[in-house]
Amino acid sequence: MKKIILSFALAGSITFAWAQQDPTAMKYAGIISPDLAKKHLSIIASDAYEGRETGKPGAEKAAHYIADEFKSLGLQPIVNGSYFFDVPLTENSLNATFAVGGKAFANGDSFYAVQPSTDRVLNTSEIVFVGYGTDAEIANTDLTGKIVLWINEDKAADGKPQGTSFRGSEARAAITKNLLSKNPAIILAANSEIAGVLTKYKNYILAPRLTIKKEDAKPADTKPAVFWITNEVAEELVKSGGKTYEQLKAGGGTAQTIKADVKISYNSVKKDVKAVDVLGFLPGSDPKLKDEVLVISAHYDHIGLLPEGTKGDRVNNGADDDGSGTTGIMTIARAFSKAKKDGHGPRRSILFLGNVGEEKGLLGSEYYTDHPVIPLANTIADLNIDMIGRVGYEYKDKADSANYVYVIGSGMLSTDLHNVGEKANKTYTNMVLDYKYDDPKDPNDFYHRSDHYNFAKHGVPIIFYFNGEHADYHGVGDEVSKINFPLLAKRAQLAFYTAWDLVNADNRPVVDGKKEEGSK
């Protein structure tokens, strides 16, 4: 379907080649320069900002830098006279112990716990092995209050394993839900890839989780916890049963009870965390249109520091992710602010939105869209910029590597918005607009992985600009020295031209697409 839509858009965009360029727009787009981008990014992605992790001093420092820039540009502070929009967060850390037959296993080395909602201590002399957890395997088996060992891998129709993917599948998600409905004490989900995942991502897995603090918090959910475990732990759990875990795995069949001395405990520790989105407002000049607002967003947070004791560089600078997008909205803000000072202000208003907590689960944008300063009904679109300073895997060493950008979501809710983006590109920037990831069902799931999604789920049309992942994604190699500043500036100019057309058009983009099922 997306290829059909793209072909139609390109066919319809033939007239864009003759669209008249607006010299006023081009004048102010020129403010978005490689030098200006480098000036900002060299500061916010420096080691002094310590990777800008949400809730840490580096992120707070970045928020103040952005606010100071907004103030210098004359943008209005619309949060009760402030540029800072408080995002109340809770830090959730977990203490967990796990022993089998007196042998202790360490959280993050042999298992990890999907954040439980309650605290528990479990002591048992037996477990229930449920194979792949199919209905046939657990039929007539009472799992209430039991420690359940489950092979968390896919099983083909012929009964043989067909994959171990850690990423999961719809079938396994359904099995998990079904097993949880049986009210076990805990589910121990064994997967062959867990050992490697824990080796690579231990620090991330053990890091405290941030969630939005709920003012009307409901009583804690009492559903059972799920621990992902390695095959080594699974072998220890079943060894008294006369068969190895691999033999049980190959055998399948019905659920069975196995003697095992198991001790498990876990408890959560919570504390409040201070975090802010940064909002700068440029009011529109048209009395009839100024109440309509275009949002231009980027997240300024990143993933912070590697643990103390790490050899070499500890700072995840996040120059591309998303220092580049943050730099983009600051340069675009400068261009629009200068236009307004010169008497060419936008007809509609613009909200420049620096989001916090994106790396923690799109938290800042979620809180903003649930508690908007400007009604979402008045928000005509969100142009979200996340990673625009590098060349991704698929364009590396290609002839057009310095003249492309991935565009995601532009036509999912509004054909008008898609066409405006196409027209801006054809008229001014002439980049390759790659729609490869423009699909909510794309296995990379990029549509749901940045802040635009929280607008889209409320029915606000969006465009997500993205350069694709690269070898330094979420690593210490994401440095300013590797940024292609002319490419960053050109991508930001594309967003500027698209915004220029949106805020000055007679009509806002018509929403003719449907929100995803389950969206608000």
Task: Please annotate each region the language model reported.
Residues 31-49, 54-77, 140, 146-170, ...:
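Catalytic-core environment of secreted peptidases
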Residues 327, 334, 466-520:
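His/Asp/Glu-rich mid-to-C-terminal helical/loop segments that flank catalytic regions of hydrolases
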Residues 23-31, 47-57, 72, 85-86, ...:
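Second-shell loop/turn segments in exported
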Residues 22-25, 106-140, 216-318, 334, ...:
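Soluble metallo-hydrolase cores and metallopeptidase-like ectodomains found primarily
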Residues 1-22:
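Bacterial Sec-dependent N-terminal signal peptides
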Residues 106-107, 224-242, 355-462:
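Metal-dependent peptidase/peptidase-like ectodomains
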Residues 50-159, 420:
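Noncatalytic luminal/extracellular "stalk/propeptide" segments of secretory-pathway proteins
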Residues 107-217, 223, 283, 314-317, ...:
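Extracellular/luminal Protease-associated
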